[in-house]
Amino acid sequence: MNYATIKWADVANGPGVRVSLFVSGCTHHCPGCFNEEAWDFGYGDLFTPEVEDKILEALAPSYLKGLSLLGGEPFEPANQAVLLPFLRRVKERYPDKEIWCYSGYTLDGELWQDSRARCEHTDEMLSLIDVLVDGRFVEELKDLNLRFRGSANQRIIDVPSSLKAHQVVEWKGEHTIQPIQK
């Protein structure tokens, strides 16, 4: 697997400061995609054990809230095969850090049902992810006011609760704003 880039102190792709890994390879080809160059599976650099180790080291500070996976498409089967052992390492070393994943595939669609995205790694990979932002980017539904997603059709999903309930459960985390009382 190749990766397009790594953001070592990202505040846009999940709550708090995070490390964000942008994988290469995506077959969705959404019009208006912000990362079109990452559609190519060969784009960027090889995701090596040394890169994994560097990310694991970068996650050590307590102010880092977690890891975000973006793309490209993390749930392309070829990417799942590489990401799954890496996510195991992340969860083993940092069980309290949140893993967020952005996917054009939907949880209750392609990831839970028979599809080209669902493979022998999908269920375990989902079990290691805390929050999934699912759904393809739809340019006509783009809204810059949305937090942690690009278009209104995309959902922010609490994966552990969804797996337990066998249905999609919306993430109720840190996205409420309290007015200041005078």
Where are these regions (language model features)?
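Receiver (REC) domain switch/active-site residues of two-component response regulators
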Residues: 130
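Residues at the C-termini of beta-strands that transition into short coil/loop
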Residues: 7, 103, 136, 160
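Short, conserved loop/helix-junction motifs that constitute active-site signature segments
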Residues: 124-127, 150
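Short glycine-rich, flexible loops that bind phosphorylated cofactors or substrates
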Residues: 76, 140-141
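N-terminal [4Fe-4S]-dependent radical SAM core
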Residues: 1-22, 27, 31, 35-42, ...
